[in-house]
Amino acid sequence: MSPQPFWQIYQEHNESLKQPLVWHTGVDAGFFAEYSAMLNAMLYCIDRGYQFRLYSADANYGYADGWTDYFKPFCPEETAAWHHRYNIYGVASWRELHRRGTLRTMALWKSKLALRHIVGHARAWMQYGRHVRLSDSVKWMADGAFSLPGLSDQVTVNEAFVALDSVAWRFNA
């Protein structure tokens, strides 16, 4: 009997988790920037014990269905249209904007995005009936050792990205 591929182990593990995080991909960056951010979000979910879900219906790289236009599905897909406007990435903190000296010029922009995050979380509560994490919850997993399902050893962030790449990067036939 051959060992189970990591993508199957990942899917079983992800499906066993109850608390969801819905990641919005294809927002406004180049494909590989979006892809790297998605792998980071997947690692964040594994590290925190959240179920990774994907919203890509409006992906800037898709032509009909988003992610599944090119790749096999690897997690539950969300389709609610409100994700387009309200499930957006987190931005620099007020403290970080002040440190950079851009607080005055960025205050309106930051306030607008903060309002969208609040509305997005309210919409998620109405749809799911409980707290659901959205794209703005994800923090960059820059360093450390991580435990991936099905692997006995701790892995670095680069090793984790390679493993998660084998989950997500599976072309449709």
Residue ranges and their predicted role:
Residues 2-173:
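Secretory-pathway glycan-assembly enzymes, especially type II membrane glycosyltransferases
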